């Protein structure tokens, strides 16, 4: 379900005068309501974790990378949500004059929007994968849209996990959250090894082609939101939906106060992490992870990951490319950032179960990433105009108090 919440100052003023004329009280929060925000609900997809598929996938991708000479064009998110590793967070958008529906992963770790063409070839990457796996969440047929514009430019993106997509650059009308943006540039992908389309909402400097206005920038430029900023609420691990609010923040969804941390990269949504407390141990983790909604697990360098795993008695399994662990991890893992910001996550969030075996939700990678198992316990406000990410401990509630950024 998607919704747009749009209140203008003129409407609020008119309503206030109307209430006064009738001798009625003006609600205290009338001037605090969101003026221009787009609220887009996530659909949470749960797929059973499969350690064998994880291991086969990563071995296959490592072989592909050794064979390919072309460097990855982007920061590598090991897109674990794309290989059956638990909940993934996607939203429904429409493309074209005839509103062709797509369900796309909402990804703060990349910047391009791409959708799957109706005639696309899905590249199978592990045994048992359906040959039509990439088309199951909607496709796009440019010729059926009267507003479609083929820009005649090739699109190619390869992630550092080896997954890739190729196609052609288009412009068309995009609908999301009840809002509509025109002449939006995106890619129509005709070959892909990724499960479904991706709505990348990071910095334009992280785009795979020469810089262009991606979706958040266009929302601002076309006057739908005031600022290139959005807030992220993934909700609990058992919830069926979460929400991203473009141009706004839901003040009911966190405890304490939001603290703004400087973004440390010009292209990626990174902040400074200091230490991690786990099982009575303090692990030095002076690094700058990407806060990435498009990645299910959390990734650190081998040095840091090994220390975290050792603290909970987890052992590295080279075949599965994961740490085997107890199925009953207790206590919390606490992430300590700059400015005294702390986010506490139950260790149960970091348990992946495959049958009778369990695995630790932290793994090794050259790219440092705090994925969904972290973000579910944080309320995050990404301000790309102000170059900050504000964090607070999440509060799970159906209440809402939205204000404009």
Curated annotation (Swiss-Prot):
GO terms for molecular function: aspartic-type endopeptidase activity. Glycans are attached at residue 50. Monomer. Optimum pH is 2.5 using casein-resorufin as substrate, and 6.0-7.0, the pH of the saliva, for cleavage of Hst 5. Residues 52-78 are annotated as: Disordered. One of its GO terms (cellular component) is extracellular region. PROSITE patterns: ASP_PROTEASE, PEPTIDASE_A1. The gene is SAP8. This is Secreted aspartic protease 8. The active site is at residues 107, 292. Residues 58-70 have a biased composition (Low complexity). Pepstatin A binds at residues 107-109, 292-296. It comes from the Eukaryota. Residues 89-392 form the Peptidase A1 domain. Residues 1-25 form the signal peptide. The keyword Protease applies. It comes from Candida albicans.
